[in-house]
Amino acid sequence: MNLNLIKAGNNIPSDIYVIIEISSNSSPIKYEVDKQSGVLFVDRFIPTPMFYPCNYGYINETLSLDGDPLDVLVPSPYPIQSNVVINCKPVGILKMHDESGNDAKIIAVPNDKVSKEYENINDISDISELLKKQISHFFQYYKTLEKEKWVEIIGWGDHHEAKLEIKNSYDRAKKNTSLK
């Protein structure tokens, strides 16, 4: 399976494909897909005993400011296994910094064709306050026990900000590819 062949979506930035690396509620293990081979590697064991509150993945053909593809969190009724692609719509963004710089997280829910459960969720304001608190709490503290690692939560942005971040990351990747 070559995940590099997966496009960013059907209608960037409103209709995206998210490649899942980590299932929701999974153990504190940070997995990362090697972008060259498409193989899922263990990046590290997270010493803080916390689990991911949502499925965690990325949008192919994007380049965020930290030099990696754009990170995405996908709430779903069930955990989605790693190395699976899900069609989503972006609804918001968690703006944050870590030891490597800007590290935004897009919040995207399954597309209406994938799940009717999310058809009325179109903006971060439609996401429950509890889930938003769980997400920000996780990212605020999951690196606490790792030396020289830290996170600063800046705040939430709406679906317009999320789509702008996706578009900018997509354009950045296209520009970066054309420079090579």
From Swiss-Prot:
It holds the Pfam family Pyrophosphatase. It is an enzyme of class 3 (hydrolase). It catalyses: diphosphate + H2O = 2 phosphate + H(+). Its cofactor is Mg(2+). InterPro entries: Pyrophosphatase (IPR008162), Pyrophosphatase_sf (IPR036649). Mg(2+) 1 binds at residues 66, 71, 103. It comes from the Bacteria. Its EC number is 3.6.1.1. Substrate binds at residues 30, 44, 56, 142. The keyword Cytoplasm applies. SUPFAM superfamilies: Inorganic pyrophosphatase. Keywords: Cytoplasm, Hydrolase, Magnesium, Metal-binding. It is found in: Cytoplasm. GO terms for molecular function: inorganic diphosphate phosphatase activity; magnesium ion binding. One of its GO terms (biological process) is phosphate-containing compound metabolic process. Mg(2+) 2 binds at residue 71. GO terms for cellular component: cytoplasm. Homohexamer. Catalyzes the hydrolysis of inorganic pyrophosphate (PPi) forming two phosphate ions. Belongs to the PPase family. This is Inorganic pyrophosphatase. The lineage of its organism: Bacteria, Pseudomonadati, Pseudomonadota, Gammaproteobacteria, Enterobacterales.
